[in-house]
Amino acid sequence: MVKLAAKCILAGDPAVGKTALAQIFRSDGAHFQKSYTLTTGMDLVVKTVPVPDTGDSVELFIFDSAGKELFSEMLDKLWESPNVLCLVYDVTNEESFNNCSKWLEKARSQAPGISLPGVLVGNKTDLAGRRAVDSAEARAWALGQGLECFETSVKEMENFEAPFHCLAKQFHQLYREKVEVFRALA
């Protein structure tokens, strides 16, 4: 039984639901806070995620970062050497989706020379009547960037665990591949 630790960067524009997603995941869906204050720096959420069919687990250290450019210099230091990325946008806000490429580029610049596993999460699907980003468009963009794609409604507690379970599985797979490389060298 192996317990791995992974630094997970939670990135995206302000008010897309990053903090709500992290908090609801940490509490296993037990607590949805109706109002949030703007994250002005970085919040840290830690949760252990079992990897199915292995007996192993990944402890995700989820760095919930401010979505404002104002804090970007601070983010550079806090984002150093991430292991996985959770990129969040609001399905009712096309600009938040369009800005995902900027957030992805920023995260990847903090992990030069390595493959950074990640997911794209469209949040606020409960606001279907106000949807501005087509699911197929988001999925195609994510695929083109090497990201898995999910949609969720944190408010309705729908599919909020899947992105993090996927990240844990991706990180565990990288670990297994490295173990195999070392075994081949022995």
UniProtKB/Swiss-Prot annotation:
It holds the Pfam family Ras. One of its GO terms (cellular component) is sperm midpiece. GO terms for biological process: cilium assembly; cochlea development; inner ear receptor cell stereocilium organization; intracellular protein transport; intraciliary anterograde transport; intraciliary transport; kidney development; smoothened signaling pathway. Keywords: Bardet-Biedl syndrome, Cell projection, Ciliopathy, Cilium, Cytoplasm, Differentiation, Disease variant, Flagellum, GTP-binding, Nucleotide-binding, Obesity, Protein transport, Spermatogenesis, Transport. The keyword Cytoplasm applies. It is found in: Cell projection, Cilium; Cytoplasm; Cell projection, Cilium, Flagellum. InterPro entries: P-loop_NTPase (IPR027417), Rab_GTPases_membrane_traffic (IPR050209), RabL4_euk (IPR034112), Small_GTP-bd (IPR005225), Small_GTPase (IPR001806). GTP binds at residues 12-19, 64-68, 123-126. One of its GO terms (molecular function) is GTP binding. Small GTPase-like component of the intraflagellar transport (IFT) complex B that promotes the exit of the BBSome complex from cilia via its interaction with ARL6. Not involved in entry of the BBSome complex into cilium. Prevents aggregation of GTP-free ARL6. Required for hedgehog signaling. Forms a subcomplex within the IFT complex B with IFT25. Its role in intraflagellar transport is mainly seen in tissues rich in ciliated cells such as kidney and testis. Essential for male fertility, spermiogenesis and sperm flagella formation. Plays a role in the early development of the kidney. Component of the IFT complex B, at least composed of IFT20, IFT25, IFT27, IFT52, IFT57, IFT74, IFT81, IFT88 and TRAF3IP1. Interacts with IFT25. Interacts with IFT70B. Interacts with RABL2/RABL2A; binding is equal in the presence of GTP or GDP. Interacts with ARL6; recognizes and binds with the GTP-free form of ARL6. Belongs to the small GTPase superfamily. Rab family. It is linked to Bardet-Biedl syndrome 19: A syndrome characterized by usually severe pigmentary retinopathy, early-onset obesity, polydactyly, hypogenitalism, renal malformation and intellectual disability. Secondary features include diabetes mellitus, hypertension and congenital heart disease. Bardet-Biedl syndrome inheritance is autosomal recessive, but three mutated alleles (two at one locus, and a third at a second locus) may be required for clinical manifestation of some forms of the disease. This is Intraflagellar transport protein 27 homolog. The gene is IFT27.
